[in-house]
């Protein structure tokens, strides 16, 4: 599989997990920068995707070339994965969606 790109929606195998993390084969949005993808050539940073609307303001609706049904990026669950967990391509979010996702991640990191 080619290198992931920022905003790409990929299929990942997330087992084993702990607590409230999603398990199994799931879609995730790549949030790594191009520089991180280039430097950390065996890793990728992602946020998982859900089709359940919980009404949480930090869950970002995916816009772009993605799924036939509404889906949301779960920005509170940023995870760095081995690229060996990537098992396929699912689509691409638009630039505005990726910016919204990254803004939420930055908000979680700011003091």
Model regions and ranges:
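Conserved functional hotspots at enzyme active or ligand-binding sites that engage polyanionic ligands
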Residues: 1-111
């Amino acid at each position: 599989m080619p290198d992931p790109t920022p905003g790409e929606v990929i299929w990942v195998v997330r087992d084993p997990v702990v607590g409230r993390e999603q398990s199994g084969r799931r879609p995730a949005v790549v949030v790594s920068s191009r520089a991180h993808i280039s430097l950390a050539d065996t890793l990728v940073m992602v946020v998982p995707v859900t089709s359940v609307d919980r009404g949480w303001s930090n869950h970002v609706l995916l816009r772009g070339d993605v799924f036939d049904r509404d889906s949301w990026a779960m920005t509170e669950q940023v995870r760095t994965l081995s690229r060996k967990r990537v098992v396929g391509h699912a689509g691409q979010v638009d630039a505005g969606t990726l910016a919204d996702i990254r803004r939420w991640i930055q908000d979680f990191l700011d003091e």
